[in-house]
């Protein structure tokens, strides 16, 4: 073999090995299927991925779980707190794809590949309620801070081309929710947040107000690396086509966003104040009678019914904390609807009965929403709406599909063909949405209170440990001093004795 031939062989082998390395570093469907799991990168947050008392949750998490299940592989979430870190993990092959509510932008299209879009959002500039509302870029007079690496930066750069005075700060330390809190505390004047994320957070921070949209609506999509194989992108195209057509995406969207489209500042503030001022008196009763239910859901139902007023009364004749009819109270064995404990006991018992009446094939949380609607409008009318849904080709076991048909019970051409006739079908839709909002907000406030209690307990334990350590050290020091003093006296006595001799 000549030296030239040997050199060619070395070059060919090097190129081949390099190609193999690239093959191993890039994501491919065959590789994912072979190893039996998929790594999905995301950002911690209420729209993506978070931990609850019942396990993991989040729109992106559940959608990613659906995708992993469709491939029959294990889902392994790789969460981060930083967009920059997220992109690095994708480029280095640590994750196979990103599912984090990422906008499709011009710059990102140059660096990554995207799956089909599944949602459209707009980006809102927000400020604190009570301050002067900025209606356009020229109205911005204070500090604007956004998350580093976000699509907000790209949109701000576009705006700066026609607004040369526009300035902003980019943070690698704080996420969108933390920046919202900085707006509320007055540390900064403005920030930018996606409309879906804002809808969730305004339930917890009602003082956040919208100034204006900084862009036209943008599509959200999952992201894969530039050198990912076509097979993984093809599988994503197939997956999103399936969840679009079978109603999975619609149901998931309703679960996380369907009940928060409308925001009422006064209502939200009033509820948060009631949680702090009124609820503590009745919380033990909700916990006592909820049993297998989440007591916070029972409390949310009660707030919707009576605003936690034990003597509440409606023109329809319902009364008490859970606003029971006289007939329902008798069925539940309740003697006095105005007795707070009896009312909560009766309401809990009746709601559990509504849940039990739902067909077993209806999964949670849909069966909970159906039970709430039944609690409000009656089981018969709910079934009428489910039948209409089925006749129209919808799924009668999905709340998102039935809720759109409930208002049809007010139209003669529909209710004349039902078993139970006319009903104000819009009421249970609003009723369920309200309770879901109250429940979400109460759950968030309750979890925050628990976190603060744990933090306080840890701080107290640390303080006690430090105090105990100081006491021990002081005791040791005193003992050492006494020993030293004793030794000194003994030495003096020895010296005196020797001198006397």
UniProtKB/Swiss-Prot annotation:
GO biological process entries: cell wall macromolecule catabolic process; cell wall organization; peptidoglycan catabolic process
Keyword field: Cell outer membrane, Cell wall biogenesis/degradation, Lyase, Membrane, Signal
E.C. designation(s): 4.2.2.n1
Pfam family, one: SLT
Region (Non-LT domain): 20-260
Active site (record annotation): 305
Record region (LT domain): 262-501
A GO term from the CC aspect: cell outer membrane
The keyword Membrane belongs to this UniProt entry's keyword annotation: yes
Membrane-protein topology: Peripheral membrane protein
Chief location category: membrane
Single GO molecular function: peptidoglycan lytic transglycosylase activity
Cited SUPFAM superfamilies: Lysozyme-like, Periplasmic binding protein-like II
SMART domains: PBPb
Region named Disordered: 478-501
Annotated localization: Cell outer membrane
Reactions it catalyzes: Exolytic cleavage of the (1->4)-beta-glycosidic linkage between N-acetylmuramic acid (MurNAc) and N-acetylglucosamine (GlcNAc) residues in peptidoglycan, from either the reducing or the non-reducing ends of the peptidoglycan chains, with concomitant formation of a 1,6-anhydrobond in the MurNAc residue
Signal peptide: 1-19
Role played: Murein-degrading enzyme that degrades murein glycan strands and insoluble, high-molecular weight murein sacculi, with the concomitant formation of a 1,6-anhydromuramoyl product. Lytic transglycosylases (LTs) play an integral role in the metabolism of the peptidoglycan (PG) sacculus. Their lytic action creates space within the PG sacculus to allow for its expansion as well as for the insertion of various structures such as secretion systems and flagella.
Domain notes: The N-terminal domain does not have lytic activity and probably modulates enzymatic activity. The C-terminal domain is the catalytic active domain.
Entry-linked NCBIfam families: PRK10859.1 (NF008112)
Family: In the N-terminal section; belongs to the bacterial solute-binding protein 3 family. In the C-terminal section; belongs to the transglycosylase Slt family.
Protein name according to UniProt: Membrane-bound lytic murein transglycosylase F
Organism annotation: Colwellia psychrerythraea (strain 34H / ATCC BAA-681) (Vibrio psychroerythus)
Lineage: Bacteria, Pseudomonadati, Pseudomonadota, Gammaproteobacteria, Alteromonadales
